[in-house]
């Protein structure tokens, strides 16, 4: 910290906020996941981690409730160029598959693009397994792992690590969508399926609290009502209570 000036110009040193901490020194590690291969309406979230890193040096560090906020030891490794390249390649093929669904339906699209769908699902499984292992290592080292995506599907590996590390935990989801669809568009780990997968796979998940949901299917509403772990605060109810 002797060379870090919280009142000076942010230095683009490769770490988030230009902070001077290494991973070994950090209490919190941000894991960038440049992935949006299942995004069904518009791409670009895979660029999010790098964009956030690039903009982070523009921030100031005064906080009314946290004295000397800049002493929070946070580290962010470089965005994986390998996974960004894999994502971009699969996105191009996946877009053709998604476009065909919107014209001819899911069954017809899968008959033509089945190999593409399988490749994306397999790559996603590998990504999730890699992320889980990375998060497990950080948890065992006494650090707090955070995922910086990327589409909504990306944190599942982190959630699996938490599930393996704790006897019980909860998820707070602030979102417009419930993400409770089962393999949306055939993607086993779709951005629209992460909370469905969490409820299905995580044995120690005790509560899923959803806040601000405003765009949801009837089947998702039914699942939300039937699973006692799910507590959904719909946007329309919050608005009615506020006004």
Model-derived features: where do they sit?
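Conserved alpha-helical scaffold segments that buttress catalytic/binding sites
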Residues: 2-243
């Amino acid at each position: 910290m002797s060379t870090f000036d919280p009142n000076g110009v942010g230095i683009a040193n490769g770490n988030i906020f230009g902070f001077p901490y290494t991973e070994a020194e950090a209490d919190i590690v941000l894991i960038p996941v440049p992935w949006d291969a299942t995004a069904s309406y518009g791409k670009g979230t895979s660029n999010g981690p790098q964009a956030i890193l690039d903009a982070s040096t523009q921030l100031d560090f005064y906080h009314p409730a946290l004295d000397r906020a800049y002493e929070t030891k946070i580290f962010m490794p470089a965005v994986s160029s390998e996974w960004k390249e894999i994502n971009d390649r699969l996105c191009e093929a996946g877009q053709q598959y998604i476009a065909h669904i919107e014209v001819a339906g899911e069954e017809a699209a899968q008959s033509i693009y089945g190999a593409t769908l399988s490749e994306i699902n397999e790559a996603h499984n590998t990504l999730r397994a890699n992320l889980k292992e990375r998060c497990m290592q950080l948890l065992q080292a006494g650090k707090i792992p955070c995922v910086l995506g990327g589409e909504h599907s990306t944190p599942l590996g982190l959630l699996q690590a938490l599930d393996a590390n704790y006897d019980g935990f909860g998820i707070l989801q602030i979102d417009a969508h419930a993400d409770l669809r089962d393999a949306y568009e055939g993607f086993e780990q779709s951005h629209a399926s992460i909370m469905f997968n969490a409820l299905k796979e995580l044995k120690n998940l005790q509560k899923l609290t959803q806040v601000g949901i405003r765009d949801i299917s009837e089947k998702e509403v039914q699942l939300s009502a039937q699973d006692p772990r799910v507590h959904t605060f719909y946007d329309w109810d919050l608005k009615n209570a506020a006004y």
